[in-house]
Amino acid sequence: MENSNHLTESWSLSWQSVLSSQLWRLEHLYWIENKAGQLQRFSLNRAQRRLHERLWYRNDILKARQLGISTYVAMLMLDMSLFRSNFHCGIIDKTLVDGTGKIGKIELAYRSLDYVPDDPTEEDLALAELGRLIKGEIQA
């Protein structure tokens, strides 16, 4: 990137092509906190990918533990809120504490759109710049 303050036209066009893929956005733009309490880029696991491939307007998800489905749904809600116009979503959970935790995942992923990890690669820097631009568009 010659100028990190704005996207060049060709760079912008290349981002437009990848941003049109929801799966790409889910696996490249969003950061979550792992079990060790460290930030890591969200990457769909097998159960999440299977649900994503079969996603429909209404989905029944049987209760299961530790498959990451609530994390996937939280990232999907954030993604759809950012990239679809007039999209509204909400969380209904068993307790306020549980619901607040899920909203916290969304909040963290949004705040971390422009996160640069320690010892970043060129891709990390480019994705952080893209995240900064996305946040700038939302806040404008």
Regions found by a protein language model. Give the residues of each.
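Phosphate/NTP-binding elements of NTP-utilizing enzymes
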Residues: E2-A140
